[in-house]
């Protein structure tokens, strides 16, 4: 499958550009390759974005950008914003007002037979047509709100899924209620007036600062206080009331555990793999010497000093729980209920990482339990019910829907071990995001899963009387609870819910540097 991208777009400035300002813009455009090639694998440079032409028109820079799969043309356009804003803001006090795409043609080449099956396909947000072995998607008049909603990549994913759809995902075969069905909801009693993107506001106020790693942030004292307040409430009002006991789970997970979980079958591209170093001090000395002389990191040399991948950074947080019980015999009349909140969870979102709600590094309170099927399903229901009660106590607007991507089934097409599955593998609780106007969208803050015998079989766990054993887990995404809370309450501490204010007492201040946070021009 080959993808090509051809974009006509524009960057809108706060005022018309002088000749000197145009020259400054052209300097950035001449160095665009270094901007576009960041993160592109070696040998794939020709598939990154390239500027085909550009012209100035008043306060607008019009651009034609083409690309292959890597740093897709719309990503290239977005990447230009920051260096242009920095250069023009610093030297000419000109800001970037917005980014727009006038016309965007994406061509997906595949086998002609596969393409033919998609004739007449309706793809949300764009026009789609099939010509021979090509599916052509055309987007028109795309603004920043659509780009933030990731509609382009979602449309491509939709088409690719349709092309590859030889059989349904296992989730859809197993689930007795159609994924996406809303099973409960709550409307806020107060009038919600805040309608800005919490990521934009948090960054502007200095509550967060971008970290160099993709999908990572530095969280400063004010937002950290909110993190801790919500975490404490979830532990006090939900987790401990149900009866979970706290443990400290490892976060560096051996690959063989992921294999036994079958996680490597479903989402192998969604993890950070860890390579231990070879214990060869002399070779590392060469690496250090070369780095000191060249003033850059010799990556190729470093690769040769690393062993094969042996671990992943925990992508689900519950992995150690199943390993704890491997080969053990339990009594389902004495179920085990643990929870962990001891560190970060890591998932590689790739190009999907955006804002504070979809990050590669995030905090969660993870509950995991084992017992009889009846106990496991009852406990899952409690983990949802108590979370709903907390949201209502805080007057947070939410809904609960049947999930379409339980982590242990995601991406998998079949199961050949005779596993017992629940009628509903996953429920997902979402907090409403009022700043997204085009559709009613929520951030998933709680994921409540029942696994049936999936992990019991994989880790050879038995009951001493031969009775059925199931497992379940619920993750409370603290990072996303924070995003949902700020999206509905805003950043004025006086407007926050009394329960949160009582927890925090006095909101810490943002550290003030000479150069940060940036002041409004």
From Swiss-Prot:
Pathway: Aminoacyl-tRNA biosynthesis; selenocysteinyl-tRNA(Sec) biosynthesis; L-seryl-tRNA(Sec) from L-serine and tRNA(Sec): step 1/1. InterPro entries: aa-tRNA-synt_IIb, aa-tRNA-synth_II/BPL/LPL, Ser-tRNA-ligase_2_arc, SerS_tRNA-bd. Its main location: cytoplasm. One of its GO terms (cellular component) is cytoplasm. It is found in: Cytoplasm. Thermostable. Fully active at 80 degrees Celsius. Its EC number is 6.1.1.11. This is Type-2 serine--tRNA ligase. Homodimer. It is an enzyme of class 6 (ligase). The keyword Iron does not apply. Zn(2+) binds at residues 318, 366, 473. Consists of two distinct domains, a catalytic core and a N-terminal extension that is presumably involved in tRNA binding. GO terms for biological process: selenocysteine biosynthetic process; seryl-tRNA aminoacylation. ATP binds at residues 347-349, 358-359, 480. Keywords: Aminoacyl-tRNA synthetase, ATP-binding, Cytoplasm, Ligase, Metal-binding, Nucleotide-binding, Protein biosynthesis, Zinc. L-serine binds at residues 316, 347, 364-366.
């Amino acid at each position: 499958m080959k993808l090509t991208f051809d974009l006509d777009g524009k960057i809108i400035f706060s005022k018309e550009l002088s000749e000197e300002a145009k020259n400054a813009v052209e300097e950035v455009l001449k160095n665009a390759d270094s901007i576009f090639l960041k993160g592109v694998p070696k040998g794939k440079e020709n598939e990154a974005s390239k500027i085909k032409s550009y012209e100035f028109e008043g306060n607008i820079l019009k651009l034609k950008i083409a690309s292959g799969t890597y740093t897709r043309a719309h990503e290239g356009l977005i990447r230009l914003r920051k260096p242009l804003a920095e250069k023009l803001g610093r030297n000419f006090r000109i800001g970037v007002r917005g980014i727009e795409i006038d016309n965007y043609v994406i061509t997906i080449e595949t086998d002609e037979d596969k393409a033919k099956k998609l004739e007449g396909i309706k793809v949300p947000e764009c026009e789609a047509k099939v010509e021979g072995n090509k599916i052509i998607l055309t987007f028109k008049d795309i603004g920043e709100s659509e780009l933030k909603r990731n509609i382009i990549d979602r449309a491509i994913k939709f088409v690719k899924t349709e092309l590859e759809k030889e059989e349904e995902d296992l989730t859809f075969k197993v689930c007795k209620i159609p994924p996406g069905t809303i099973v409960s909801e709550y409307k806020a009693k107060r009038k919600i007036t805040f309608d800005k993107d919490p990521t934009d506001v948090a960054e502007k106020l200095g509550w967060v600062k971008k970290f160099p790693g993709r999908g990572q942030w530095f969280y400063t004292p004010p937002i950290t206080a909110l993190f801790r307040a919500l975490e404490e409430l979830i532990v006090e009002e939900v987790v401990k009331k149900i009866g979970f006991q706290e443990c400290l789970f490892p976060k560096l997970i051996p690959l063989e555990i992921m294999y036994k979980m079958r996680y490597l079958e479903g989402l192998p591209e969604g993890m950070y793999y860890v390579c231990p170093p070879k214990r060869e001090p002399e070779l590392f000395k060469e690496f250090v010497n070369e780095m000191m002389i060249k003033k850059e990191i010799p990556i190729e040399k470093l690769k040769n000093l690393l062993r094969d991948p042996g671990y992943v950074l925990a992508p689900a947080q519950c992995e150690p729980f199943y390993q704890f019980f491997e080969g053990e015999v339990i009594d389902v009349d004495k179920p085990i209920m643990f929870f962990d909140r001891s560190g970060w969870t890591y998932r590689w979102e790739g190009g999907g990482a955006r804002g504070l709600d979809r990050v590669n590094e995030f905090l969660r309170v993870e509950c995991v339990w084992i017992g009889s099927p009846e106990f496991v399903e009852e406990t899952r229901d409690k983990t949802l019910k108590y979370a709903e009660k907390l949201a209502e106590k805080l007057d947070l607007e939410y809904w609960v829907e049947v999930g379409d991507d339980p982590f242990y089934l995601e991406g998998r097409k079949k199961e050949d071990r005779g596993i017992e599955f629940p009628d509903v593998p996953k429920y997902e609780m979402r907090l409403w995001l009022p700043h997204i106007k085009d559709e009613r969208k929520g951030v998933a803050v709680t994921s409540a899963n029942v696994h049936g015998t999936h992990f019991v079989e994989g880790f050879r766990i038995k009951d001493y009387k031969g009775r059925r054993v199931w497992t379940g887990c619920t993750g409370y995404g603290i990072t996303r609870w924070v995003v949902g809370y700020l999206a509905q309450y805003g950043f004025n501490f006086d407007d926050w819910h009394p329960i949160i204010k009582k927890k925090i007492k006095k909101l810490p201040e943002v550290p003030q540097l000479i150069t940060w946070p940036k002041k409004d021009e």
